[in-house]
Amino acid sequence: MNPLIIKLGGVLLDSEEALERLFTALVNYREAHQRPLIIVHGGGCVVDELMKQLNLPVKKKNGLRVTPADQIDIITGALAGTANKTLLAWAKKHGISSVGLFLGDGDSVKVTQLDAELGHVGLAQPGSPALINTLLAGGYLPVVSSIGVTDEGQLMNVNADQAATALAATLGADLILLSDVSGILDGKGQRIAEMTAEKAEQLIEQGIITDGMIVKVNAALDAARALGRPVDIASWRHAEQLPALFNGTPIGTRILA
C-alpha cells in the first residue's frame, strides 16, 4: 500500500488522553499492517500558550497565523521543539522507533514565503522523498513538524494541513487530516460523509464553513486534486475507529478530487 500521512491538529497535543488513544491505535495498526506511516503536525495550541506566557499578540489573517520576524524563533521552538519532541516521547513510551524532522530535512518539502504581509509564513511544495523513504525502509516512524526553510535560509511557519499535502505529493502518500471535529458538519451539525469542491464552495458562501475550517477544507481539496485520490478529514477522539481509518475506511468526511 501507499504510505499514509496522518496529520495531527487541534488540541491533540494538549490532551494526554487523546495522545494515549492515538499512539495505542498506531501500535495496534503497525502490528497488524505493513503500511508505512508518517506523522505531520502543527501545534497551534502550544504556540498560543507560549505567546500568552510571553505577552505577545496572536494575529491571524484568513485563518493563517501572522508570523513577524521577532516571533519566528519562538514559533520554531514551540513546533519543531516542544510539540515535535512531545510526540517523539509518546512514540518512545509506546515502543515505536521514531525520528523527529522538520520540512527542510532532506529537502523533503520545498518552502517559499507565501505573502510578505503574513511575515515568516511559508508556501509548501513537493520536495525530495529520499530521506523519508530511507527512514520508512528502516522501519522508523517519521514525525515531521510544519516548520520549513527557504533556499535563502529563512525559517518559515507553514500551515500544517498544507505541509502535509505537500509531503503527501512528495511521497505519493495517502492523507488523513485528524482534528478535533469528526468531519465537516452541515448547517444542522450533522457530519457530511463526502464533500466535493462544489459542495464546499456552497457551504463557504452560506457561512457554514468558516475560519480555520476553510483552510482545512481547501487544503484537503488541494491534496485530493494534487494526489488524484480522496483525502479524509476525521477526529482522533474515537480511537477504536482509527485502525479502520488508517486502512482506508472513511469515518469522517471524505474529500473528493
Swiss-Prot record:
The record's annotation in InterPro entries points to: AceGlu_kinase-like_sf (IPR036393), AcgluKinase_fam (IPR004662), ArgB (IPR037528), Asp/Glu/Uridylate_kinase (IPR001048), NAGK-NC (IPR041731)
* Pfam family name, one: AA_kinase
MF (Gene Ontology)? acetylglutamate kinase activity; ATP binding
Listed HAMAP family: ArgB (MF_00082)
The task this protein performs is described as:
Catalyzes the ATP-dependent phosphorylation of N-acetyl-L-glutamate.
Q: What is this protein called?
A: Acetylglutamate kinase
What is the reaction catalyzed?
A: N-acetyl-L-glutamate + ATP = N-acetyl-L-glutamyl 5-phosphate + ADP
Family of the protein in this entry: Belongs to the acetylglutamate kinase family. ArgB subfamily.
Q: Which GO terms describe its biological process?
A: arginine biosynthetic process via ornithine; L-arginine biosynthetic process
Report the enzyme's class at the first EC level: transferase
Q: Which residues bind substrate?
A: 43-44, 65, 157
